């Protein structure tokens, strides 16, 4: 019988514990975590994501504000706004909601955000620290949340064969390095790779983040594998499905995540955690006491 990993419940439990730690930060350290989200334009999906982030932040005691800017804002004007937030000591986390309009360089914007306020974990310096295995860095939220879900099923991953399907800077590549740090043997694949079925059939862990509905087939999956579905695809007038054949794999995998209700809530939970880590880093407080 396949365990359907309830990401929503796990995320809520994490946020409940984090809320208690935030109370301690406020009471004993006079640290009031603050997150600023910049939304450029009026993309409906981005508006929903930002609203969910702000709602969760406020529910656990993180001060949060969304700064909405017009989609015709110049790159330099956006950079200027980010620098204002960088210089504000009361702001601990800065998130620029992606995607950005085509005339704005996402890379330049991401690397303008202060390394210690980069709660998305996308800044080149934080990426470099992740690659080197350093602990005092901010790690992208979706892979961090995905790893937590895997470890909710199996704590010791040492020696496991893991496959990551997808090579994005947001999920695939950081997921590769996180699994490597857990002493897994990791293979990274993508939509153009050959012999995906062969690689997946040997994997104890499969993380799918390729952005194609039902891309991962049931006959690719080894019996007893853990399958994490990061994909979220809209099909048939608003129905959401992931990157894996959920019904086909259910009953074969040891555990798997649903879409929705799997990885999505964990991304937001770890954004909250990164905001607390960022606040601790900036105030010289050991973050490990507040994120366990």
From Swiss-Prot:
Keywords: Amino-acid biosynthesis, Histidine biosynthesis, Hydrolase, Methionine biosynthesis, Multifunctional enzyme, NADP, One-carbon metabolism, Oxidoreductase, Purine biosynthesis. Catalyzes the oxidation of 5,10-methylenetetrahydrofolate to 5,10-methenyltetrahydrofolate and then the hydrolysis of 5,10-methenyltetrahydrofolate to 10-formyltetrahydrofolate. This is Bifunctional protein FolD. Belongs to the tetrahydrofolate dehydrogenase/cyclohydrolase family. Its EC number is 1.5.1.5, 3.5.4.9. Pathway: One-carbon metabolism; tetrahydrofolate interconversion. SUPFAM superfamilies: Aminoacid dehydrogenase-like, N-terminal domain (SSF53223), NAD(P)-binding Rossmann-fold domains (SSF51735). The gene is folD. GO terms for biological process: L-histidine biosynthetic process; methionine biosynthetic process; purine nucleotide biosynthetic process; tetrahydrofolate interconversion. It comes from Wolbachia sp. subsp. Drosophila simulans (strain wRi). It comes from the Bacteria.
